[in-house]
Amino acid sequence: MGAHRFMGWLLVVAFAGLLFAHPGLYSRTGLYALLVGAIGLSWLLLLVRRRQWVEFALPRELAWPVAVVLLSAGLSLLVNVDADWRALWLLGSQLLFLWVGWWLARCSSTVRLLGGAIVIGGAVAGLYAWCQFLRLDPLPTSTPFGELRIVSFFANPNHLGNFLACAMPLALAGWLEAVADRPYAGRSARFQPIVLYILIGLIYGGGLLSASRGAWVAGLVGCLIVGGGHLWEVGRGRTKLHLLPLLGLFSLLVGITALLSQRPVVRDPQKAVSMSERILSSRHIVQPYSTLDSSLTAAPGDSILVHDNAINHRYFIWQVTLDMIRSHPFAGLGYGSYQKRFARFRDAKQEEEHFKTLNWVAQSEATPYAHNEYLHIWAESGILGLLGFLALVATILRQIVLGIGKRPRQALYLWGALGVVAVMLIHSLVSYPLHLPLNGSIFWVLSGIIFGWDSGNDKLSL
């Protein structure tokens, strides 16, 4: 087994272990630390054994934003005397996955292996979500959500929704490519569109059952990017439009949506919320509460009418985070110190009307994340850290756009990669997917693959 293949299989095993980390079985965070150690040690041994430093040197376009991110994190820790340098291990693990993904991209079979693992993993997670929905889960509930929400293997329905939203664009891109290649494929490969058709149904259904509104919006945008990219390739004469298979896929997705539209996806103790009601409640993302005439209210805090408690809490967290940013806008409060600093800024708002609309859990919780990756980075690492991250993202997007123009036979998969990146960036506006062990690892490995995709790999498939 070659080095690329070995590292590829090591990542697949890591992804599988992180996916199947049911809260009732073992800790996903603990396993993540062990896997990062194993992958890091294997990577170090590979560097020492091969001794071809040029082979592992990151391109300049990728190296400089990475350097800015590292510099900003280190600077934030230096200027905050009580900061904890041990927090850097998370950033180091993310950059390790980016580096390994960049190097693995030179082996097309490894890229196929990783892409297939993500899609199959998404289908398995979706299937388990269906089992929970039908009350066929063989394992006891081990999360605070109990039987109120569908979480599959995860501890939080938003984590499930994000993972499936990432798997969906890859599965869709693979299905479109398989349909286009079917007339020219071998006998066994002709069944690939049917297999992917089933996998897409499981992923899509599981995503709906997660009832994660942020993941729904992000996943929809990711799929629209892949669909729009397919039409773009058709317009340029690079592929053909196969209407009958597309109609079949559209019918499948509509059928699943109709099946679940009136079924409860949030079993609130006071009221079960159907999927259609959950979709309609997405409007509260832009208006979680209304301000009433305080002269007509009887008690403090009654001057605000809350439409959605969860989103209302997010808005409060963002307000606290903005206060944290204002206090240290340039160097930040210290990488990895968000939760440690949050309580002081939260308590400073105790007399404000918005604070009084929160339930007692939200009023006392020291949340570890800002539920917005961009604000979180700015609060911890300062403006330099945010600019470094945005530069890294811009470089990734630029690489995808250049690849779509230069590599016609890889274009659909690059559209799929763009869809996944879009899912993560959009969901990062209202959640913290980059901090999740499995979801974040997939993003960084994929980002590295996008950079390292060799122009000689003209044929890639899931």
Language model: regions and residue ranges:
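Membrane-embedded alpha-helical segments of multi-pass membrane proteins
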Residues: G30-L46, L88-L98, L160-M168, V217-L224, ...
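Hydrophobic transmembrane alpha-helices and their immediate junctions
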Residues: G229, I383-W415
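Membrane helix-loop boundary segments at the extracytoplasmic
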Residues: A16-Y26, Y374-S381, Y413-F451
